């Protein structure tokens, strides 16, 4: 908690500690969304970053397989890869924001709801 509240560079923000319009502004106004976590349950925060047209730099972990790939985000395995990816993103050498946004669109709540309705209809027809 001390790191989040005091001991970090002034250009670093921790999204879990602000909400609403402030969160939306941070997600759309940041230079990049950097999420090096070893664990993630569903990837909702990543989906939010993709929907906000962010440059996304992630650790390549299984929860993202099948929906986030190297076309839509920078996927890394080591500190050196994270440094390299962040440098490429921040210097403008790579820009995967449009592809990332398409991933977010493909997982929109409306599309997911339609899929759920179809699944229920199939079960009812059995």
Regions found by a protein language model. Give the residues of each.
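Nucleotide-activated donor-binding/catalytic signature segment of Leloir-type glycosyltransferases, i.e.
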Residues: 1-18
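A charged, aromatic-enriched C-terminal amphipathic alpha-helix characteristic of glycosyltransferases
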Residues: 94-124
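Aromatic "clamp/platform" in nucleotide-sugar-dependent glycosyltransferases that forms part
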Residues: 38
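Short alpha-helical donor nucleotide-sugar binding micro-motif in glycosyltransferases
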Residues: 17-18, 25-30
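Short glycine/serine-rich donor-binding loops of glycosyltransferases
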Residues: 43-46
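Short hydrophobic beta-strand element within catalytic cores of glycosyltransferases
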Residues: 51, 55-58
């Amino acid at each position: 908690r001390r790191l989040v509240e005091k001991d970090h560079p002034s250009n670093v923000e921790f999204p879990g500690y602000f909400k609403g319009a402030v969160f939306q502004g941070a997600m759309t106004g940041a230079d990049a969304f950097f999420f090096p976590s070893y664990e993630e349950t569903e990837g909702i925060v990543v989906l939010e970053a993709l929907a906000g047209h962010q440059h996304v730099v992630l650790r390549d972990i299984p929860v993202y397989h099948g929906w986030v790939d190297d076309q839509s985000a920078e996927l890394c395995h080591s500190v050196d890869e994270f440094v390299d990816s962040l440098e490429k993103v921040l210097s403008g050498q790579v820009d995967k924001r449009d592809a990332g946004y398409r991933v977010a669109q493909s997982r929109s709540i409306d599309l997911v709801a339609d899929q759920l309705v179809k699944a229920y209809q199939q079960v009812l027809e059995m």
